[in-house]
Regions:
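Class I SAM-dependent methyltransferase SAM/SAH-binding core
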Residues: 1-11
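A short glycine-rich, Lys/Arg-flanked "PGG" loop and its adjoining helix->strand segment in the class I
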Residues: 34-49
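A short acidic, Gly/Pro-enriched loop at the edge of an enzyme's catalytic core
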Residues: 9-21
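Short glycine-/acidic-enriched loop or helix-start segments at secondary-structure transitions
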Residues: 14, 32-33, 61-63
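Conserved Class I S-adenosyl-L-methionine
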Residues: 81-83, 88-140
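Conserved class I S-adenosyl-L-methionine
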Residues: 49-81
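Short, hinge-like loop/turn segments at secondary-structure boundaries
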Residues: 22, 68-71, 107-108
Length: 140
């Protein structure tokens, strides 16, 4: 195994040189990530597989926060984007669990603007948040 530094739209790899790709929050929100997906088409070998994990804004507490923070991202359009390009969706339920409220608040403030973070934190109690993601996969 080797690790290379690069960007999704300019992978430092030869054509048809990769068997498995795993990308987590690298191809944000579907539309707009076409250059990165074109790179996957280039570098993944025939019968190779790519896996992409992305937020599922259509469900979960975090999903409702995400819709507030990023109202321009349409969950239905994102799903259509991936599925019309031959990707298969596996919904995954997970959870953020923190040892302190301060830790939860710190992470929420990384994810959202001050206004959105303040609002969702004021409405949410505790140190856990249910979080839904989509695992998108495609065989090449």
């Amino acid at each position: 195994m080797a690790v290379h530094q690069g960007t999704a739209q300019a992978l430092p790899l030869p054509d048809a040189s990769v068997d498995v790709v795993h990308a987590r929050w690298a191809y944000y929100f579907g539309p707009g990530c076409e250059p990165g997906l074109a790179e996957l088409d280039r570098v993944v070998r025939r019968d190779g597989t790519a896996y992409v994990i992305d937020n599922d804004a259509s469900r979960s507490t975090f999903g409702s926060w995400f819709r507030r923070g990023y109202p321009e991202v349409d969950p239905t359009a994102v799903e259509r984007f991936w599925s019309t390009r031959g990707w298969t969706r596996i919904p995954v339920d997970m959870r953020w669990s923190f040892t302190s409220r301060a830790d939860l608040e710190s992470v929420v403030r990384i994810e959202f603007t001050r206004e959105v973070a303040d609002a969702v934190l004021a409405e949410h109690e505790g140190t856990e948040v249910d979080y839904a993601v989509n695992l998108w996969w495609k065989r090449f």
